[in-house]
């Protein structure tokens, strides 16, 4: 199993960053790597329960993932399971994602994305590239 951790700093208080990374209206602006959009979704990470999204790339290829929001501790953290679906819509290997937010200075926040339980180093590298791209979009939105 492989894990990855990414960190960013935002010039906003934890409450605002938490909203950016959990609420549907904000998630849809940065969810998915650059060049991909959200085609279908049940995407609300602000409360426990099931979630899913289908991304579409520039060529029209679909990429579905889903999971369960396990814990929500506003404005500090949210944790959820993560699994990709294959072409027959069968959900594959399950991993976990955790977003952690803490105050940084008077009005900023440190954001940490921790993705654990990835099946191997190649998967971790692919997710690192994907999440890094997503976070660039989030930085433009929330920066």
Feature-to-residue mapping (PLM):
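Hydrophobic ligand-binding cavity/cleft-lining segments
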Residues: 1-37
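Hydrophobic/aromatic beta-strand elements that line small-molecule binding cavities or substrate pockets
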Residues: 8, 41, 65-71, 95-103
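A short, structured loop/turn motif at beta-sheet edges
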Residues: 14-15, 70-77, 100-110, 143
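Hydrophobic pocket/interface hotspot
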Residues: 17, 27, 51, 69, ...
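Glycine-rich portal/gate segments that line the openings of hydrophobic small-molecule binding cavities
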Residues: 39-81
């Amino acid at each position: 199993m492989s894990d990855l951790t990414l960190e960013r700093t935002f010039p906003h208080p934890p409450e605002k960053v938490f909203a950016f990374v959990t609420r549907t209206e904000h998630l849809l602006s940065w969810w998915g790597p650059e060049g991909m959009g959200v085609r279908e979704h049940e995407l609300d990470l602000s409360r426990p329960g099931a979630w899913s999204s289908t991304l579409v790339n520039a060529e029209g290829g679909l990429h579905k993932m889903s999971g369960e929001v396990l814990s929500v501790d506003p404005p500090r953290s949210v944790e959820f399971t993560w699994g990709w679906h294959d072409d027959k819509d069968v959900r594959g290997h399950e991993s976990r994602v955790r977003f952690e937010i803490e105050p940084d200075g008077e009005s900023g926040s440190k954001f940490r994305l921790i993705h654990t339980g990835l099946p191997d180093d190649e998967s971790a590298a692919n997710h690192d590239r994907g999440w890094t791209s997503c976070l660039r979009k989030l930085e433009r939105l929330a920066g």
